[in-house]
């Protein structure tokens, strides 16, 4: 491999032109047909006032622009033929999937702790079929998209994500969504350990907690696990002549 070539996955057959995306810590290349855009947990629970994060005391006031930028990333991906994967985090209405006191999730999940502290919230937070669990109105899956429920922070845990990606020859995962420092980072890390290239579009993500957690998560990702870019760069890369080139 050329030492000056950008990082990332390129089809070794040379049949497809690799897209080069400006990113930190260095530019990263990917093939559109070996890439998915992952939208992590853009549910009312995480992005809307009155949802779980808001009720648990987290600030969701800045999620509006994030939703708009995710919509742009989704539109750019679809126009380039990149499949979109949507995650929804939560459990069955009886919370069997959440685990009981023998599970660390029972002790650490802020949703479960909020419901124990406020019994009137029981079966309202992150329960499948509820408003809290639903995706925000501004973001809607389309036919051909993949929608996956997940019971823990990582999208690889107890889901068919890995097998679905491998069946389609996917090597690069582009991430958007909430929360950067929890489910986004957890899924990207798990992907890294499964040999996927992970890219985060930073301005299409939002942290759970103070802004320092966003900065820390992105720094951690770019230093150890993947690459960090933004929506405008993603749009520009996909609309470039390079992205449209398919060598004979």
From Swiss-Prot:
Hydrolyzes ureidoacrylate to form aminoacrylate and carbamate. The carbamate hydrolyzes spontaneously, thereby releasing one of the nitrogen atoms of the pyrimidine ring as ammonia and one of its carbon atoms as CO2. The active site is at 41 (proton acceptor), 150, 183 (nucleophile). One of its GO terms (biological process) is uracil catabolic process. Gene3D superfamilies: Isochorismatase-like. Pfam families: Isochorismatase (PF00857). Belongs to the isochorismatase family. RutB subfamily. Its EC number is 3.5.1.110. Signal peptide: none annotated. This is Ureidoacrylate amidohydrolase RutB. Keywords: Hydrolase. The keyword Transcription regulation does not apply.
